[in-house]
């Protein structure tokens, strides 16, 4: 249960949400993404963020992409192409829409570093890191204003984690990226705003605390190198 959640997220940049397991972090992501409805209060996504009405779930879903923890468990297609084009319109008069989606797909594959992966590649043969990239590309094709990610680094080796962190740093430049993660040390350097969720589901802004920790870490790292003055 989420209680007294009060936060405004920037249109661009990466917002990190931390907290103990079971606090409701993943529930918050599903609310933002339009997969569930709040029982009270308001939740606005988009231009009407100054109004007092909740953005309808269908509209939130249209404006928001979400990548679940271990997204590979939710893949439905056999090949990369089937995954990327799942749900595209198939009617005879949908040519213009499909062409636009194809352009977006090309851009998305480049954005996540999969432009060299053949579209007929079977998804099951991809590495864990490339499966995460594919999950991101699927959402980017939809061109969401908000991109939510639940534990994006979970279960990956250190090199893949570093590559995905760098990718998120790029993606946040054009949209709001909301990340739920226990991997604070790795996400912290690219975080613009941070919240801690309590066991009661309330959010506390810890952006200044995070910035202070980052500054101290930078100072300690600098002290580790000899001075050449």
Short names for language-model regions:
Residues 147-151:
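Catalytic Walker B motif of ABC-type/P-loop ATPase nucleotide-binding domains
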Residues 157:
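ABC-family nucleotide-binding domains
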Residues 175-180:
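Conserved H-loop
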Residues 42-59:
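ABC ATPase NBD Q-loop/coupling interface
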Residues 122-126:
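Conserved ABC ATPase signature
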Residues 33:
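Helix-to-loop junction immediately C-terminal to a conserved catalytic motif
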Residues 99-117:
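Conserved ABC ATPase "signature" region
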């Amino acid at each position: 249960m989420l209680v007294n959640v009060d936060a405004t997220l920037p249109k661009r940049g990466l917002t990190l949400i931390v907290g103990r397991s079971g606090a409701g972090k993943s529930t918050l992501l599903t609310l933002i993404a339009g997969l569930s409805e709040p029982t009270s209060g308001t939740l606005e996504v988009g231009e009407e963020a100054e109004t007092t009405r909740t953005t309808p779930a269908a509209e939130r879903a249209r404006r928001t992409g979400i990548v679940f923890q271990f997204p590979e468990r939710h893949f439905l297609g056999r090949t990369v192409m089937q995954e990327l084009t799942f749900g595209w319109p198939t009617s005879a008069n949908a040519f213009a829409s499909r062409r636009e989606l194809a352009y977006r797909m090309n851009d998305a594959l480049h954005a996540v570093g999969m432009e060299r992966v053949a579209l007929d590649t079977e998804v099951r043969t991809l590495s864990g890191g490339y499966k995460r990239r594919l999950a991101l590309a699927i959402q980017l094709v939809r061109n969401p204003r908000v991109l939510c990610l639940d534990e994006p680094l979970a279960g990956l080796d250190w090199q893949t984690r570093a590559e995905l962190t760098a990718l998120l740093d790029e993606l946040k430049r054009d949209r709001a990226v909301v990340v739920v993660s226990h991997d604070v040390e790795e996400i912290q350097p690219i975080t613009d705003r941070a919240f801690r969720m309590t066991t009661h589901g309330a959010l506390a802004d810890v952006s200044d605390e995070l910035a202070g920790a980052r500054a101290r870490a930078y100072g300690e790292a600098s002290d580790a190198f000899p001075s050449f003055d």
